[in-house]
Swiss-Prot record:
A zinc finger (CCHC-type) spans 321-338. One of its GO terms (molecular function) is zinc ion binding. This is mRNA 3'-end-processing protein YTH1. It comes from the Eukaryota. Residues 1-20, 211-255, 343-366 are annotated as: Disordered. It comes from Mycosarcoma maydis (Corn smut fungus). It is found in: Nucleus. SUPFAM superfamilies: CCCH zinc finger (SSF90229), Retrovirus zinc finger-like domains (SSF57756). Its main location: nucleus. Pfam families: zf-CCCH, zf-CCHC. Component of the cleavage factor I (CF I) involved in pre-mRNA 3'-end processing. Keywords: Metal-binding, mRNA processing, Nucleus, Repeat, RNA-binding, Zinc, Zinc-finger. Residues 212-224 have a biased composition (Low complexity). The keyword RNA-binding applies.
């Protein structure tokens, strides 16, 4: 009655035993499916409620829990309902915009989730919610004022006018720059208590506290608004050789000039560099080598010959340097001022020029 089906194969072959292998019938499949209880997805362990209430763990997603059962503890679909009939956690079915599920370690919005391309779901290390306060600012738009991605950029484009600071002079009562001021002029109603002599709210008062006296240097330094200029590199990292930026305008290096030496030439490193260049030029060097002769000293951060003590960085006396190209002392091989001198030029043998080269290149008779 329930004889197993057989598989008929066409063609001859030595493996005839596989043609009589029994197959699973449809009745056997029905019996196997009926052995699994239909209420298995609705079963709830006794420790699940403790995990949900005390450990604050969300065991089931909102899509897995039956909303009818969670509201009325009964479902018209009964055991055939495809969703679970369990008591939901307090983290389920939260209103839109709720921050109860927000992980404190996640502070940035996932840029892939904004396009619907994040595959990590709840395992993602970034926020899966649209929060403008947590979207990082576009570095290119903030630096250059435009972004090549345009509207497709996944980062925040902040208007530069919004990031302007408030004018501290206008907040005190008057700004001499008027509409030409680059800072924000926020209008506030004058505080009547402050005009009468005292305001108990102090700095927390939302109204304006008009002051007739100019701000002192001490008040500017203690003000919560940044009214002083930013620190220069010399002030932030300390002073040293070549740093004299007193006013923070970057003119420290330009204002420093070496004192005049002999024949009106600058003394110190400049004179030493110029002397080395003149030596190279007197030896038959090319014109471009005169200015480049001083480059090794600047590259390695050391002063030229004759420089004063106290400089920083690498030092090398040019009188001890031997050029491996021309064999002369006083310069490096990459700054050799004698390109026409015979010798080994980095593996290429250069012979004498002029008539000797013409005689060498002249075709010989048979």
């Amino acid at each position: 009655m329930n004889a197993p089906l057989t598989l008929h194969r066409s063609g001859a072959g030595p493996s005839s035993y596989s043609s009589h292998r029994p197959l699973i019938t449809q009745q056997r499949l029905v019996g196997a499916s009926s052995s699994i209880p239909s209420q298995f997805i609705h079963n709830e362990f006794s420790f699940e409620q403790y995990i949900k209430d005390h450990l604050n763990v969300k065991l089931d997603n909102d899509a897995q829990i039956c909303p009818d059962y969670s509201e009325r503890l009964q479902c018209p679909r009964g055991a055939s309902c495809p969703r679970r009939h369990v008591r939901p956690s307090h983290l389920n079915f939260l209103p839109a915009g709720s921050t109860a599920l927000r992980d404190p370690n996640k502070r940035t919005v996932c840029k892939h989730w904004l396009r619907g391309l994040c595959k990590k779901d709840d395992q993602c290390d970034y926020l899966h919610e649209y929060d403008m306060r947590r979207i990082p600012e576009c570095r290119f738009y903030a630096t250059f004022g435009f972004c090549n991605s345009g509207d497709d950029c996944l980062y925040l484009h902040v208007d530069p006018a919004i990031k302007r600071r408030e004018c501290e002079r206008y907040n005190r009562g008057f700004c001499p720059k008027g509409p030409l001021c680059t800072k924000k002029h926020v209008r506030r109603v004058a505080c009547p208590l402050y005009l009468a002599g005292f305001c108990p709210e102090g700095l927390d008062c939302p109204r304006g506290h008009v002051k007739s006296t100019p701000a002192s240097s001490a008040s500017r330094s203690n003000s919560p608004i940044q009214t002083h200029r930013p620190l220069t590199a010399a002030e932030a990292f300390g002073t040293g050789t070549g740093r004299g930026d007193e006013y923070g305008d970057g003119a420290g290096m330009r204002n420093q000039r070496a004192p005049a030496g002999r024949y009106g030439l600058p003394s110190g490193g400049a004179a030493g560099g110029a002397g080395a260049a003149d030596i190279g030029a007197s030896r038959g060097g090319m014109g471009y080598a005169n200015n480049m002769q001083r480059r090794p000293n600047n590259v390695f951060g050391a002063p030229a010959q004759g420089a004063q003590e106290g400089g920083r960085g690498w030092r090398k006396d040019l009188s001890e340097v031997l050029c491996f190209k021309c064999g002369e002392m006083g310069h490096f091989a990459n700054m050799c001022p004698n390109p026409a001198l015979p010798g080994n030029r980095g593996g290429v043998e250069r012979g004498p020029g002029g008539q000797a080269r013409q005689a060498r290149d002249r075709p010989r008779p048979y």
